[in-house]
Amino acid sequence: MSDSFSARLEAAVSALPARFPGPGGAVAVLKDGEVLVRHGWGYANVERRIPFTPSTLFRMCSITKQFTCGTLLDLYDDPSELDADVDARLPQLDEPSPGMLHLAHNQSGLRDYWAVAMLHGAPIEGYFGDREARRVIDGTRTLQFQPGTSYSYVNQNFRLISDILQDRTGRSFAELLQTSIFNPVGMERAILAAETRAMPDGTVGYEGSVESGFRPAINNIWWTGDAGLGASLDDMIAWERFIDETRDAPDSLYRRLTVPVTFSDGQPAPYGFGLQRTKMFGRDVTMHGGALRGWRSHRLHVASERLSVVVMFNHMSAAQVASAQILAAALGVPYEPERSTQQPTALYGTYLERETGLSARIEPAPGGAKLRYLMVPELLEGISATRAEAGSVVVKAQETAEGAEAVMERPGENRTSILARCDETPGEDIAELAGVYRCEELDEAEVTIELAGGVVYGGFSGILGDGRMEMLQRLAKDVWVLPCPRALDHTAPGDWTLAFERQGGSVTAVRVGCWLARDLMYQRV
C-alpha cells in the first residue's frame, strides 16, 4: 500500500464526522481481504454516553435483503421450487402471481407495502407488526406490471421470502440466518433485530440535525427478511472478508448472489438477490444501503479491486454518499465529475406520466435539471436544450400532434414512458375537488379532500386508521400532490400524485400514486 493511497484514505475517513455530523458512526475499508480501516466515533447513545465502537450493534435495515437471499440460496438450489408458496400468500390477486425469483430481484410487480400502508391511514410512528403486514399484503388484487418485465423496489418481496422459508422449514428466520449465514461467516454478534423500537445493547438512532438538535427517533415496525438484521461493524467486516476468501470458489455464496440477472426479455437487470449492480468510477460494483428513521448504512464491494467499504451512521446523513467518497479516495479518482453547463430549457415544466398517472416536475438546477418523480429528486445533466440525463434516466423533449411531450427512459426499470405536459394555467374551481373518494383495490380505502379556510387539504383512511390531513400543492389543472415526507419507513413515498378526472365537467374520480405504489383509482362517493 503506497503512502499516497494511505494518505488519501486517511484524509477521507478523518473528514467523515465533519462532513456528516451526528451522534456517531463507523466505517470499514478492506482491500485484498485485509482490514485497512476499522473505526468508530461519537456515541451509540448520547443520553447514556455509550461510545460507538466497532462492536456496537447497528440496525442494518435493507442491507438485510442480501442475507435473506443468501439464506434462500443456501437452503434451495432452485428457489423456483417455492413459487406456489408465493401464490398462496397472495389470496386475492386477480392475475398470475410473481415467482420467488421475481421477489428476490424486485421484479414482482407488487406495490410496496410501506407506501400502501400510508394509503390505509397508518400513523407515522404507529405500530406495524405481523398482523398489519399480513392485512396489507393479503389485500393485493392487482400488480403494477407483469412479473419479470420491470423493476420496482418492494420491501415485502423479502418479507414474503423469509416468511415462506420459516413455513417451509419449520424454523424461525432468526435461526435460519444463524445457521446459513452468521455461523459460517463468523458474524459473532449479528442477530435478527425484528423490533425497531430498541437495540439490545442500547444503541439509539437519532432524527434531527446540528441546527435543530438530535432526538431519539421513534420506530414501531417489526421487520423480518426485508430489513431486520442487527450487526456490528466487526460483523460486516467478517462478511466482507468471507466474500474475499471465497471469491474463487465456483459455488461461493456471494458469487451466487451476484450472478447476472435479466428481465424476461433478456435485458440486463440492475438488481438481483437483494443487491444493486451498478458502475462507480468505471468499476462494476455490488452494493446496498439501509435506512430507517435514525439509521443510515451502506456497503459496497468492487470485485475487480478486491475492495469493500462499509459505513454506518446512527443519524440521518447520507451513508451512500459517504461510502462513495471513501471509494473514490481508495481508487484515487475525483468524487465529483465535471458537469455540463447546458440548460435543457425545452424540458422545464410539469408533466403527467401516461402509463402510471404519476407527476413529473422538471426544474432548472446547476448544470442541468432537477427531476421530481421518485421518492427524492434526481439531478440530471443538461446535454442539450431538449435532453437531460443521469446514470439511471434519460429525458428528451418531443413535439407530437397532441402537443409538447417528453420521453423518459429508465433502463434500470426496463421501461420507456411518455410524459404529457400539463396545463399549468390557473382557473378551475377548487371547491369542486372536495369530497370523499374510495378505492376498491384497497379494501375501500378512502382519500378525503376538504377546503379548510379556502385551502385544499387531503388525508388517507383505511384498515390502519385515519392519516394526517396534509395541505395539497397544485401542480397544474386537476393535478395536485399530497406530500408524505415522513412515513412508517425512512424512505417515505414522497409526493402522492392526485390526478382528478372529470366527466361532463364534474369531478368523478382521482388517480392516486407514487413510484412505490402506482395507478390506483379512487371513485367519488
Swiss-Prot record:
HAMAP family: D_aminopeptidase
Sequence similarity: Belongs to the peptidase S12 family.
Function text: Hydrolyzes N-terminal residues in D-amino acid-containing peptides.
Source species, domain of life: Bacteria
Signal peptide: none
Designated gene of the protein: dap
GO BP, sorted A to Z: proteolysis
Pfam family, one: DAP_B
Protein name (Swiss-Prot/TrEMBL): D-aminopeptidase
